[in-house]
Amino acid sequence: MAFVLCPDLQREQCIPKMRRLLFAYLVLAAACTFGGHYAESQQSTDIRRVLDGRMLPGEEVATFERSETLYPSDVVRRGSVIRALPVADKRIESVLFQIGDKRYDLFDYLALNRVAGLLVLKDGKVALEDYELGAGPRTRWASFSMAKSVTSTLIGAALQDGLIDSLDDPVTRYVPALRGGVYDSVSIRNVLEMASGVRWDETYTDPNSDCRKLTDAQMSHQGGASLAYMKDLPRAAPPGSVWNYNSGETNVAGAVVEGATHLSLAAFLSQTLWSPLGMERDATWWTESPGGMGMGGAGVGATLRDYGRFGLFVLSDGVIADRHTVPEGWFQEAGRPHRIGGKSVDYGYLWWPMPPRDPIHAGAFEARGIFGQHLYINPSQKLVIVVLSARPKPTGSTVLDDTAFFAAVARALR
């Protein structure tokens, strides 16, 4: 007897569905064999202390190296083939840059910004690779909000695969748990632009902020707690009229990915990018509960080189094996400033456009995370820079300007 998985679909529609079902089965089998998530008992440092910036330097580094212990975490499986990163003919030994009336060099940047890992890829080749603070090539380092840009990319992949029809679809089409609440009139595009109009306070260090209340909900490790909190928030403005940075919004974006693909964020990332891109190590991604919904706003843990490989994928406009994994031009759209409520905002689809004050950054954009995490993409210079750091506070630490350093690197390699 033959099993017919999708008798109501044409063959070209059926094959992708069969592949997704097969992949989901393989992921489940791997989870049963190897452990698809990290147990709650493995958690150590309280995430609230992390957000408060109340950690000694050594404890902070140890925590960022084992970010999967902060929450239950799914494993993002790599494939069997590793993509080599060749060494560039032109290497960076040092670089000079100026901020105000003071001059700095590479060594100042590494030391003063508490950099654990720095990778520079020019034309797909390694121009600089450095590890500090005890980190090394196999160290998986916390992405924090750089994961938002990964989630954005997965939405692009789901759109390309026809699993999402349009960015103008309401998020509730893919996330039924949000129906009947403040997100009823919010589109996927609104969420990607952080322009839902939902009231939100992002203050990391304030226990009464929405950011911290969402953290408390996630710390309960109860499935559905995050979406329940988001659903009941009040409205501050009409959708699409005001920009407001909102990490909770990206958990909604992650839920859209999971609802559209019927896979976890980790499984869809593995299927779409991590395996075919030739990553050298499994990654991890936070979930709100063991085996539960992935956190679209934070929580990827990956090696320096694998973040770099992801950056090269972005630089290629999302092409893998001559196929667009995301819609053509997706990253140009995702990485440029958008107009919200008639005003230009320096934010794209969960990516940060670089400030235009230095022409070397023209068309460049980055993924950015608290404590000094950066994935800088400069298409015109064919340049990717990854910075993994352990700054003392989530934001506001006195450090050297990253954009000035990136500009100096770009000029040194022209």
Predicted feature descriptions by range:
Residues Q10-I15, C32-G136, I164, E193, ...:
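N-terminal leader/targeting segments and the immediately adjacent pre-domain N-terminus
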Residues A142, D161-R199, T203, D232, ...:
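Active-site helix/loop module of the DD-peptidase/beta-lactamase fold
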Residues M279-T284, F331-V384:
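Active-site Gly/Thr loop motif
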